[in-house]
Regions:
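Glycine-rich anion/phosphate-binding loops
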Residues: 29-34, 90-102
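The substrate-binding groove and active-site-proximal loops of carbohydrate-active enzymes
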Residues: 83-91
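N-terminal beta1-alpha1-beta2 module of alpha/beta enzyme domains
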Residues: 1-82
Length: 102
């Protein structure tokens, strides 16, 4: 890789989008621990943002309460910015969305 390309990549902000998948044989509690571990590793590697997406009624996905999971991850990281990578707007009153994510 050329020096110019290398310097451009080093200035690129990287993010993670986590759906909090429950691996086969695992539990939601395992997933939450793994999500925190992934966020901490992303932070150590210099990623700038960690996004969590909301999903409901999907077997194998544990991110139904996005705002709670965001707080859980943010409370166990130091610098990485943690936020919502997707909210199902019809499922929530507008004021709740504004208060939690505004």
């Amino acid at each position: 890789m050329s020096h110019l390309a290398d310097s451009r990549l080093s200035n690129t902000a990287l993010s993670v989008l986590d759906l909090a998948p429950i691996r086969q044989g695992g539990s939601a509690a395992d997933t939450f621990k793994e999500t925190v571990a992934l966020a901490q590793q992303a932070e150590r590697l210099g990623f700038s943002r960690y996004w969590l997406a909301e999903h409901h009624n999907i077997e194998g996905i544990a991110s139904a309460a996005t705002s709670v999971l965001i707080g859980h991850v943010a409370g166990q990281t130091e610098r990485i910015r943690v936020g919502s990578g997707g909210i199902m707007l019809p499922n929530h009153p507008p004021l709740v969305i504004a208060e939690q994510f505004g």
